[in-house]
């Protein structure tokens, strides 16, 4: 049968007990964002016999080999059906591999990187890989179009100018300030340390001013979600300018 839904596969197996050996073929690496994970969990519940898994080639290793780039030092993200931060990750790593997919994900990825001043990164895009319709493009992001990232595709980003700074603390003079009040450096450091943030934390900065606290929190973890709330129009503008300056999405 041609089927990808876990429950349908399990139902078929239950209904056909006459089969002593069953093979299930999935594309890609079974340990790399694969449907094999959920399927194995369900099969373990209904099958008493041993389950054997044989991995294929992941989209990451396939794309990397096609463009001649090693990937052992790449940061890996999946934006397929997920709303995740990725600008800061690309800003802080020499290589980032991303899986794109879903409505407008590719366009959002393309436009967001340009918005944050990352148009100079080298990008490799692979769509329909290993099929007859395979399309692989390489070049600077600013040379490409949003349409190049449409559909289910994999992207390998090389950023030779990535941020190598080990410390997360920012000095007051690094922020764009204007006449809007700003929480001073020492207070920011102590306050954020006391929060004991986790990597998946959600933070609300009410009365964010220039966004100094919001930005320092965002820099503390690439997937921390920060909501900066400010009613002063000048402050709102400064928050937007500072988040782009420090590439905290």
Residue ranges, per PLM feature:
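Short alpha-helix immediately C-terminal to the canonical SAM-binding loop
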Residues: 236-237
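Conserved class I S-adenosyl-L-methionine
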Residues: 200-209
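Conserved alpha-helix/loop element of class I SAM-dependent methyltransferases that forms part
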Residues: 184-199
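Class I S-adenosyl-L-methionine
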Residues: 1-52, 223-226, 230, 241, ...
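Class I SAM-dependent methyltransferase SAM-binding "motif I" and its flanking Rossmann-like core
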Residues: 28-94
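Gly/Ser/Thr-rich loops at beta-strand to alpha-helix junctions
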Residues: 27-34, 55-59, 101-105, 210, ...
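Conserved SAM-binding loop of SAM-dependent methyltransferases across substrates and taxa
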Residues: 210-222
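A contiguous loop/helix-start segment that scaffolds small-molecule binding in enzyme catalytic cores
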Residues: 3-7, 21-22, 95-180
């Amino acid at each position: 049968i041609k089927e990808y839904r876990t429950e349908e596969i399990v139902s078929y197996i239950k209904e056909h007990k006459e089969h002593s050996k069953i093979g299930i073929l999935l594309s890609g690496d079974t340990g790399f964002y694969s449907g094999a994970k959920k399927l194995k969990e369900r099969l373990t519940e209904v099958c008493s016999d041993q389950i054997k898994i044989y991995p294929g080639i992941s989209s990451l290793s396939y794309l990397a080999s096609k463009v001649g780039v090693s990937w052992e030092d790449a940061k890996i993200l999946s934006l397929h059906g997920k709303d995740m931060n990725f600008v800061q990750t690309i800003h802080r790593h020499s290589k980032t591999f991303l899986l794109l997919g879903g409505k407008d994900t590719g366009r959002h990825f393309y436009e967001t990187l340009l918005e944050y001043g990352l148009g100079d990164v080298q990008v490799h895009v692979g769509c329909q890989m290993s099929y007859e319709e395979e399309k692989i493009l390489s070049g600077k992001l600013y040379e490409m179009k949003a349409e190049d990232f449409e559909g289910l595709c994999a992207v390998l980003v090389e950023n030779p100018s990535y941020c190598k700074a080990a410390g997360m603390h920012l000095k007051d003079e690094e922020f764009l300030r204007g006449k809007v009040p700003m929480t001073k450096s020492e207070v920011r450091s102590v306050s954020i340390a006391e929060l004991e943030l986790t990597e998946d934390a959600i933070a609300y900065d009410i009365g964010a001013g220039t966004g100094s606290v919001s930005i320092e929190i965002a820099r503390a973890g690439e997937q921390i979600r920060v909501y900066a709330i400010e009613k002063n129009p000048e402050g709102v503008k400064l928050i937007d300018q500072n988040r782009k300056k420090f590439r905290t999405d």
